């Protein structure tokens, strides 16, 4: 269902004009208005969900299948070296618009776009223990 005050719902459902790359009954992919690099695309579900936790699995699957197709198209069109496919869930993860969306960003070896974190490490056996606990929750 569409949220009447959500800007991304309005973009996804055509209430605000956009440069649309792709559209079907579930999704709209548009050019990002403030791109990290030229060719930066945002995939938006037409149904409102704040994050991946709320989004129906079919929408998640369709969004990431489309992300792959867009990545291939961007490499052909832009000649980019690689592509980032990004999706943030919640403020602590960097989400700023609370409507699920996927960024598809063409990357070039010498561009100014950075995605950085400070690596940490596990104690001996800790990774296996965490993996087991996650698997139990699936």
Task: Specify the residue positions occupied by each region the protein language model found.
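HIT superfamily nucleotide-processing domains
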Residues: 1-138
């Amino acid at each position: 269902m569409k949220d009447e005050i959500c800007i991304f719902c309005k973009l996804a459902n055509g209430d605000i004009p956009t440069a649309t790359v792709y559209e079907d009954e579930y999704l709209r992919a548009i050019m990002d208005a403030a791109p990290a690099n030229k060719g930066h695309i945002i995939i938006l579900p037409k149904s409102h969900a704040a994050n991946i936790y709320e989004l129906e699995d079919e929408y998640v699957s369709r969004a990431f299948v489309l992300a792959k197709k867009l990545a291939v198209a961007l490499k052909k069109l832009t000649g980019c070296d690689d592509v980032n496919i990004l999706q943030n869930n919640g403020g602590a993860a960097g989400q700023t618009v609370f409507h699920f969306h996927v960024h598809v960003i063409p990357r070039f070896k010498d561009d100014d776009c950075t995605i950085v974190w400070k690596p940490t490490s596990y104690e001996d056996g800790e990774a296996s223990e965490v993996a087991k606990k996650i698997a139990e929750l699936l």
